[in-house]
């Protein structure tokens, strides 16, 4: 919608540009205020936030992957003026056509994650960590575990 311009942040330069082009083509009433790839350092956050603010965007789609996108949003939301920020994971890869979505049957039964894991086997490491994470959340909640863990290294 023209009243809610969007900004895309994340992916490779080629992927985010192609995602922007496809969104503009498929949704002619959507105003793309701008886009920027996701390969930048923390030192560039202020410059990126300024670019987003100056674009006039009201919605920011952040596709930096989990948990980087959530951490980036949390760290920078105060710099973004009146902007709604949403983490979208690898959506730009799908929108750009770089990655195919799971067949509809897989989507309907909730197995799109498995299809993506087969396309990108490196995701398997994350899946293995989830039960451990849940167990540690429970143990921590009841004071049975107190050590800090860096999950994503």
Per-region residue spans from a language model:
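Short, flexible loop segments at boundaries between secondary-structure elements
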Residues: 37-43, 81-119
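A transmembrane-helix-recognition feature enriched in membrane-embedded lipid enzymes
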Residues: 101-153
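Proline-aspartate-enriched helix->loop->beta-strand connector
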Residues: 52, 56-66
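Short Gly/Thr/Asp-enriched flexible loops that form oxyanion-binding sites at enzyme active sites
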Residues: 20, 70-79
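Conserved beta-alpha
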Residues: 1-51, 55
